[in-house]
Amino acid sequence: MAKHGFKMIDAEMHVMEPVDLWERYIDPEFKDRAPRRLNERRWDIRTVVEGQVMASMPGGDWPALSDAEEKALGDRYAEAIARGFDPESQVRAMDKEGLDLAILYPTSAMYITAFDTMDPRFAEAACRAYNDWLHDYIQAGDPGRIFGAAAVSPHDVPTAVAEARRAVGSLGMKAVFLRPNIYNGRPWHDPAYDPLWAACQELDVPVGFHETTGSRMKAAGADRFKSLGIAHISTHSVEQMLA
């Protein structure tokens, strides 16, 4: 699949997590609080974290897809849907797109640390569970072609450092994933995060920032637009630049 001697790499390919990921993988201490992805309609990425329904617009629910959107997505992802978005479907999608390698980012797990005042231990447990699942997912697919970006929780920097070390050293992750939003009043240039940046530098892995619309974090433009499309354009582009 290499073209003109260059490998084709997708640096941000998303997974569709199973609805019971955290129920199966989270530390038993937190099982009664486990995040869960809703499955009440097709393409449901809404995720419940500590009673908060993420992927919802201010003052309302995440809008349902139109019939045309349903058909377009259904046609495009027919094979993956039939396989339940399993690891094999991820690899087959890469084959169709002519990709040699891909770094996998989350969908539902984008929301598992996404509001202030979270219990830091719970947030860390949710990240560990996702990383453990992603490792198993990659091993069941093609670990020579698909690689993971580990989720770490900014709610407690020492545990974020520890999880980055575990995810890279023990699980083979190739990047660390963070949301670009300000957590607990601390922008990313705050010296409190220096140990995390130092750990990533020592581990020789990049940090990837990725915004999602509809979280409980303050996001640029989220309070100005009722349209999902416009809010998405604003929050994703501006938050990335601000980070």
Where in the sequence are the language-model features?
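Helix-coil boundary/capping segments in enzymes
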Residues: 1-243
